[in-house]
């Protein structure tokens, strides 16, 4: 009886950098086997690269073919004017827009700024889709 009490109350022994197994743990858990491990892998509902690519591509197509004229008309309305003329037409030579970054070979003028803007909108939509599906939200779109 004295040996089992001494084993329970003694400080843990150190063997190298690991703690040596205590006699108490070896005696009490001999009959219990560890539970069988199951191979469970977390799987995403949607492939992120596919969602981001499709969302960005769809956003660029919508920006180029659907919303382009609407966007250009609204930008033209917001140009600063004085007496019905733009500042450049009124004689301010510094009011001319820098055309280097806005120049493109696209027939309607879809330029680098448009690509970056509509591409970022596509990425935002893709992030929203991936975040909501990973939280378990599954909207019944088609049924």
From Swiss-Prot:
CC annotations in GO: chloroplast thylakoid membrane; photosystem I
Regions that span the bilayer: 50-70, 112-132
UniProt keyword annotations, A-Z: Chloroplast, Membrane, Photosynthesis, Photosystem I, Plastid, Thylakoid, Transit peptide, Transmembrane, Transmembrane helix
Pfam families the record matches: PSI_PSAK (PF01241)
Topological relation to the membrane, as annotated: Multi-pass membrane protein
GO biological process: photosynthesis
Recorded superkingdom: Eukaryota
UniProt transit peptide range: 1-44
Gene3D superfamilies (alphabetical): Chlorophyll a-b binding protein like
Compartment list: Plastid, Chloroplast thylakoid membrane
InterPro entries xref list: PSI_PsaG, PSI_PsaG/PsaK, PSI_PsaG/PsaK_dom, PSI_PsaG/PsaK_pln
Annotated coiled-coil segments of the chain: none
Keyword Methyltransferase among UniProt keywords: no
Family note: Belongs to the PsaG/PsaK family.
Protein purpose: Not yet known.
Protein's name in the database: Photosystem I reaction center subunit V, chloroplastic
UniProt source species: Hordeum vulgare
């Amino acid at each position: 009886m004295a040996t089992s009490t001494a084993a329970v109350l003694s400080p843990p022994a150190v063997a190298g950098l690991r703690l040596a197994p205590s006699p108490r743990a070896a005696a009490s858990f001999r009959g219990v086997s560890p539970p069988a491990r199951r191979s469970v892998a977390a799987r995403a509902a949607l492939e992120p690269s596919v969602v981001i690519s499709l969302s960005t591509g769809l956003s660029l197509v919508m920006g180029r073919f659907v919303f382009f004229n609407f966007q250009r008309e609204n930008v033209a309305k917001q140009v600063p004017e004085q007496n019905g003329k733009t500042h450049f037409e009124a004689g301010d030579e510094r009011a001319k827009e820098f055309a280097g970054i806005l120049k493109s070979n696209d027939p309607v003028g879809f330029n680098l700024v448009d690509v970056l803007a509509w591409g970022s909108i596509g990425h935002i939509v893709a992030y929203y889709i991936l975040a909501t599906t990973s939280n378990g939200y599954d909207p019944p779109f088609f049924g």
